[in-house]
Curated annotation (Swiss-Prot):
Natural source organism: Phomopsis amygdali (Fusicoccum amygdali)
Pathway participation: Mycotoxin biosynthesis
Family to which this protein belongs: Belongs to the short-chain dehydrogenases/reductases (SDR) family.
Task of the protein: Short-chain dehydrogenase/reductase; part of the 2 gene clusters that mediate the biosynthesis of fusicoccins, diterpene glucosides that display phytohormone-like activity and function as potent activators of plasma membrane H(+)-ATPases in plants by modifying 14-3-3 proteins and cause the plant disease constriction canker.
Protein name: Short-chain dehydrogenase/reductase
Matches recorded under InterPro entries: NAD(P)-bd_dom_sf (IPR036291), SDR_fam (IPR002347)
Amino acid sequence: MFGSFNSLKNAWAQVFPQAPDFTESSIPDLLGKVYIVTGANSGLGKELSGILYSKNAKVYVAARSEAKAQAAIEFIKAAHPHSKGDLVYLQIDLADLSAIKSSVNAFLSQEARLDVLFNNAGVLAPHDAPKTAQGYELNLGTNTIGTFLLTKLLLPTLLNTAKSSPKDSVRVIWVSSIAVNFSEQGGLDMENLDYHEDKSAVTKYAVSKVGNFLHSVELARRHGANADGVVSVALNPGNLDTELGRDRSWLETKILRTFVLYPPVFGAYTELFAGLSDQITAEMVRDNNWIGPWGRFCRIREDIDQAARPRSEGGHGLAERFWRWTEEQVKPYV
């Protein structure tokens, strides 16, 4: 599962991280900046949106449920009454590829810039979960394919914003998970993405999170250093007490909260570091595309990192192959 002692050591450090250094007090005034946070109606997405808004940013609260999103917006506004920023609901359903373009068009009808796309939304689907609208396994279809399509459709705006913005400030953040450590050797099997050979619910979730990492690596290669200047980085937000764990028993939840789980704001700090810290550059993420909690440079499992790298760098080229596969899946919806 972990492959080597170094991988185990890295995973252990991400389960029990040091206190965060990069928090609300670390970021400047964000007036004039525009952000999208998917899954912003609850958990770390809601916490992140609150931090950005408190610094006068305009934040698009992207979520499926308008009622839940509006409740989150009202909560955040009440918590930060002096903000000069804005919170705007953006309807999005990542489990339906046919609906994503209309969400992007709704955003583009209001904005000409996008400073950071926080791909925060995700599901942790049980084994008997229904498939997506297009028939994909729910974790893969929502967390990976839907998120990829959203990013692809917003990429021209990100690239255009980067032309007139400070170096390395325009970014795409991919929220992965420590669950990648439960994936198979190399991260994922390109020949079994339809799951004709069934896998456990944990493995399916892990594969979807490996997919986020692979997409981040390939976007960084195509549009980062020596290209268009968009920083793309994946992260493990940390072990958090969020709605993703709503299907756990009360006993499991109590034990995890006591020993392992942290409040969602800590995960928001991980995303905040990835999205705004000047320590992160397009050059840096070409070599190491993984941020751990609560804003630390870490390493993903060695065999996944090796598989993702281009063949020209001694890797297996999996990031490029998975990118091309995903492009084929979303082609009818672009």
